[in-house]
Amino acid sequence: MPSKFDPLSTEKEILKFWEQNKIYEKLKEYNSKFEKKFLFIDGPPYPSSPIPHIGTVWNKVIKDCILRYERLAGFRTYDQPGYDTHGLPIEVAIEKQLGIQKKSDIIEKIGVDNFVNKCKEFALNNASSLTANFKNIGIFMDWNNPYMTLHNDYISNSWMLIKKAYERGLLYKGVHVLHWCPRCETTLADYEVSEYKEIEDPSIYVKFKVKGSENRYLVIWTTTPWTLPANVFVMINKDYEYAEVEVNNEILIMAKDRVSDVMKEAGIKNYKIVRTFKGVELVGLQYIHPLADIVTAQKGLDNYHIVVDAGEEVTLTEGTGLVHSAPGHGDIDFEIGKKIGAPVVMLVNDRGEFLPEAGKYVGKNVRSAAEEIINDLKQRNALLHSGKVVHRYPVCWRCKTPLILRAIEQWFIGVSKLKEELLKEIDNVKWVPDWGKTRIGNMVREIRDWVISRQRFWGTPLPIWICKNCGNIIVIGSRDELEKVAITKVPEDLHRPWIDKVVVRCNKCGGEAHRVPDVADVWFDSGVAFFASLGKDWEKKWKEIGPVDLVLEGHDQLRGWFFSLLRAGVILLDRAPYNAVLVHGFMLDEQGREMHKSLGNYVEPSQVTENEKYGRDVLRLWLLRNTTWEDAKFSWKALDQTKRDLNIIWNVYVFASTYMNLDNFDPRIYNLDNLKQYLRIEDLWLLSRYNRVVKEVKESMNDFKVHELANKMTSFIIDDISRFYLRLVRKRAWNESNDPDKIAMYYVLYEVLKGSLVLLSPVIPFTTERIYQDFVVDKKDSVSMESLPEVKEEFINDKIEKEFELSKEIAEAGLNARAKAGIKLRWPIKNAYVFLVSDIDVEMANNVKEVIKFLLNTKDVEIGGIEGYRRFSKIKATPNRGTIGPDFKRLTNKIVEYIENNSEKVASDIIAKGYHEVVIEGEPVQIKVNHVNILEETEEGYISARFNKGVVVLKKEISKEEEEEGIVRDIIRRIQFMRKQLNVQINDYILLYIKAPEERTEMLKKWTDYIKSETRAKEVIIGEVKGDLILPWEIEDEEYIIGVSKS
């Protein structure tokens, strides 16, 4: 293995290795023989751009990690990627390319066939580019066989869902109030309305004159003046308290609790509440529409202009408590209107312009007409107040145009009838995290029928034909089925406009049936992926491999793809199509904002993956260590730290590989049984930690918690192996002879590192593949063809792990003590003292005494109970009257006096067991830690550091011998650095030259043999300096000049 970690060159080498050796293809063949299956369906990304967002990369890396892990776990994985290729985003992009301003231009100027071909070309080109990007970051999926919603087989399969809905009596054509984009000229379903903008709109209070009165008015509030021409009735809550308010000889009717706010907003100071009354008194009251003389549609609506009770639909958080209702432009208005038999007046065309029935306003854009409507109200004394409001308003998720609500005829699937089935199926699914279940459950409880039709061009054509003669509806379930009933030839391409020409024979009257012009909701396309992606004979394949074992996407897909899949599954299969759902977070910048080019905070993946400082695995590791379901904040500092961590992991394998190769170590000729007697306690500890981590990782991955896999494995290699175990065993590796002690250490390290390599391979496949090819004996073609390491329970030892954890805590306290005394860790000390509160801890510490000695860098360590600390300290307790008084009342003064006279004894007991007991005036008293302030002073010449289990004591002053050894170790550290600078291999010898201060010359001569053994120097010349590399070093305020030459 190269001694230096170079991410980019390593990754390019591995990409080439995978391609030249057809590793994915071999893996697929190898994996196909496994008995257990793991069916994964890729939530298809939308190819609106040739370069993936870094959030999409996170998504794909999570999927890749899980698929790689499941292969290692012995599952036959289905890893087909997908692309969601239809819909408005691509249409809008092509419209921009072609300079199209309105939908009719596509038909009249471009031609639907040309437009659809352009959309297809755009989708395929971007999908091809995305595929290259995904392969470049090591995503092992079947890229030669992706499913695409534009493929004819996919479209053909998808039709079966609509046919099934029809057969179940769920498919119908009806009128509902839906969001509509006037620019794209198509409807949007509720779940597509997820994007909002802060928009300034009018905020007006309008007076509707009560019929038959001279001066009584109902006051309504609206921010959509354009809906007033379509007003039919007014809604109230009959249980609210309403008021008649006198203003300028007019009586204004509004909710009592809203009077103050309305008057304030309207700037009216002089007003008087004449009377208050329950809303029920208003029910049935008739009014005169203020624009009846200029809006044609208002003629004939007089009998419907009444006040109706809408119950809790009317609130008092804003407005007047009276709500203007236009059933043609409001969903609640529509539902209430349906109950009372009110007509649906819808006055707006597909482009958001008023229809002729709007009278004066015909042809005008509804939002632009607002000011004209306000002026007309003002002229008719119907405007109480006009202002502005900035509020969150829904916009089209692709073109960003403000949406409008329209009552329009569309095709629906009646999923509201399936609510109970859907809720039941949600309970049968594993949700990770479990709040995903709550969120999607809340959606289902509010479910509305699924509007599946869209008035566009680039999409899956609805397979609905209607007979011209008898109106019979024929729903087709596949291409094969269409070919059996078609009078005309079925085109190769099932898209519009070619499918529009297919005529079907009516199965009732024998007449000609023509297809409806609509295409399907784009969420329908992806929602059928669980079966439509399986190609021909999908039903047979589904029986073999269904249901889906896992789907995973961002948390926004709880209302998107997961919801669509659930609906489709229950319609088609009477069950959820998936067994488990994993939700991941969004990718944000360091400030928690979404990443967009317009904000200047957008980072392209290549800025990391092609950066020589980072590379692909750095990005993958950083992404996968983020808690999967939480939002991640992109950070260059975090990437820097990840690179350092990856470098440590690389160096661990370099260390092991180097020494094992030097000693020609072959793990195949050994096993733990014949080496067991030579295992030291640190070896047993490592085996215990390794098997425990493997067990924990497997448990985590049962719930697809990839962040726990990534964090546990990297932490194990960095903290347990690199920073702890290798420190303990390094000298065993330096031993030139092949003694059993060394071989035992090698074997344990090899087994642990090989297993760790396999477990890390789903996270960092490039780095692990490179190491695997050099490090592992009897290797397979690729690390991805290995099997997960087994958990050997017999090696998990709680006792040893607790002992080592205690030794680490003691070492940490020792470091703190050294820092206080200014003694470097490299400088050995003669004695250290460890005093522990618990007898069990004392016993455990003595079991790992040699480890503690090493960690504290001391020649000897004394370990004992906490009472031993008294030899090195003075402690005393001072009374705390503030807590003694309330607890002991009349005994306070006596207890204070007792503490002052027995200060050390009280303090000693409280430190040892948390309390001190005494009898005062015949009453038992327990003095606790809150009753005293404990002051502690370590004896002169010593330094101590407390931790939660005891205290570590070190002598401040070090002997001359200890000082010399410390300086020599500092010199050795500099020499090791210089060896690296000269690229001297670990087994190569050097010639060493040292010029030291005159008073240190004798010291160096005394330590020459030690220096030679530690630096592999054949000769150490003191006094003169020469060599291939000469550097001056300042050590303890003294200058040393060191020269190193290759021997």
Swiss-Prot record:
<dbReference type="GO" id="GO:0005524">
    <property type="term" value="F:ATP binding"/>
</dbReference>
<dbReference type="Pfam" id="PF00133">
    <property type="entry name" value="tRNA-synt_1"/>
</dbReference>
<dbReference type="GO" id="GO:0002161">
    <property type="term" value="F:aminoacyl-tRNA deacylase activity"/>
</dbReference>
<feature type="short sequence motif" description="'KMSKS' region">
    <location>
        <begin position="594"/>
        <end position="598"/>
    </location>
</feature>
<dbReference type="GO" id="GO:0000049">
    <property type="term" value="F:tRNA binding"/>
</dbReference>
<comment type="similarity">
    <text>Belongs to the class-I aminoacyl-tRNA synthetase family. IleS type 2 subfamily.</text>
</comment>
<keyword id="KW-0030">Aminoacyl-tRNA synthetase</keyword>
<keyword id="KW-0479">Metal-binding</keyword>
<dbReference type="InterPro" id="IPR013155">
    <property type="entry name" value="M/V/L/I-tRNA-synth_anticd-bd"/>
</dbReference>
<feature type="short sequence motif" description="'HIGH' region">
    <location>
        <begin position="45"/>
        <end position="56"/>
    </location>
</feature>
<comment type="subunit">
    <text>Monomer.</text>
</comment>
<dbReference type="Pfam" id="PF19302">
    <property type="entry name" value="DUF5915"/>
</dbReference>
<comment type="function">
    <text>Catalyzes the attachment of isoleucine to tRNA(Ile). As IleRS can inadvertently accommodate and process structurally similar amino acids such as valine, to avoid such errors it has two additional distinct tRNA(Ile)-dependent editing activities. One activity is designated as 'pretransfer' editing and involves the hydrolysis of activated Val-AMP. The other activity is designated 'posttransfer' editing and involves deacylation of mischarged Val-tRNA(Ile).</text>
</comment>
<keyword id="KW-0436">Ligase</keyword>
<dbReference type="Pfam" id="PF08264">
    <property type="entry name" value="Anticodon_1"/>
</dbReference>
<keyword id="KW-0547">Nucleotide-binding</keyword>
<dbReference type="InterPro" id="IPR033709">
    <property type="entry name" value="Anticodon_Ile_ABEc"/>
</dbReference>
<dbReference type="InterPro" id="IPR002300">
    <property type="entry name" value="aa-tRNA-synth_Ia"/>
</dbReference>
<feature type="binding site">
    <location>
        <position position="597"/>
    </location>
    <ligand>
        <name>ATP</name>
    </ligand>
</feature>
<dbReference type="InterPro" id="IPR009080">
    <property type="entry name" value="tRNAsynth_Ia_anticodon-bd"/>
</dbReference>
<keyword id="KW-0648">Protein biosynthesis</keyword>
<dbReference type="InterPro" id="IPR023586">
    <property type="entry name" value="Ile-tRNA-ligase_type2"/>
</dbReference>
<dbReference type="GO" id="GO:0005737">
    <property type="term" value="C:cytoplasm"/>
</dbReference>
<dbReference type="InterPro" id="IPR002301">
    <property type="entry name" value="Ile-tRNA-ligase"/>
</dbReference>
<dbReference type="GO" id="GO:0008270">
    <property type="term" value="F:zinc ion binding"/>
</dbReference>
<dbReference type="GO" id="GO:0006428">
    <property type="term" value="P:isoleucyl-tRNA aminoacylation"/>
</dbReference>
<dbReference type="InterPro" id="IPR014729">
    <property type="entry name" value="Rossmann-like_a/b/a_fold"/>
</dbReference>
<keyword id="KW-0963">Cytoplasm</keyword>
<keyword id="KW-0067">ATP-binding</keyword>
<protein>
    <recommendedName>
        <fullName>Isoleucine--tRNA ligase</fullName>
        <ecNumber>6.1.1.5</ecNumber>
    </recommendedName>
</protein>
<dbReference type="GO" id="GO:0004822">
    <property type="term" value="F:isoleucine-tRNA ligase activity"/>
</dbReference>
<dbReference type="InterPro" id="IPR001412">
    <property type="entry name" value="aa-tRNA-synth_I_CS"/>
</dbReference>
<dbReference type="InterPro" id="IPR009008">
    <property type="entry name" value="Val/Leu/Ile-tRNA-synth_edit"/>
</dbReference>
<keyword id="KW-0862">Zinc</keyword>
